[in-house]
């Protein structure tokens, strides 16, 4: 049975058709920047809601054409923390006829770990950096022993720092200071920031998920990205693989990734193209068993 899974993130809406935990086609993405302005207002803007609902509706139509028998839509930190998150969910239901599953921070962390570590047997940690939050999870053989959602993401950081490198560092340190994160040897990065950084290293001219998967991103590279970004480098010119919206925030994302490496003691992270979409599919399968 084919199942469509739609991930409503803070920066983008993603779509994939799943069948027995196998992605049948490349994931598709529409960058709607749902969390734009959320840092200042505490709510989702009307324009961002309209862009995102339209993207979800288009993917629901595509799911029907692709032969999906079920369509699942889940949302993360932007909808979870917005004062008008319920309004957004009602708009989606009215336009598409589907319910939005707004995940808790713990559920968001769990599905990211499930997706990224399906083939990993040793102890490892996974971090999922989005537009409005960063989840860090550690475990082994599918058993999680540490999980926390931190209120820092590349869009939220952009809005809060306003282009100031030192202010960005202060906000990152503040977000992580309240929690001691376990040290790890193996760290896996998922989400748009991680995969974009992987592409910048492995296929800078054109993004290719088959190439980025498994790429190792180290501290030195992250420091270079941060220096370029805040130094005024045209990131799209240097890295054509980046979309305009991603190029506008990649320096903030790299700064958060660097702090994650410092907090966990890891020297690098490995990019995974398996992420919360695969994890959510496994999550709902487990609930229905």
Residue spans for each PLM region:
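Short glycine-aspartate micro-motif
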Residues: 3-7, 124-128, 187
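Helical "lid/coupling" subdomains associated with nucleotide-phosphate turnover
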Residues: 17-20, 37-68, 76-123, 138-289
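N-terminal glycine-rich anion-binding loops that anchor highly charged ligand groups
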Residues: 22-34, 66
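N-terminal basic/disordered segments at the start of proteins
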Residues: 1-24
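Acidic, divalent-metal-coordinating active-site segment for phosphoryl/phosphodiester hydrolysis
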Residues: 132-138
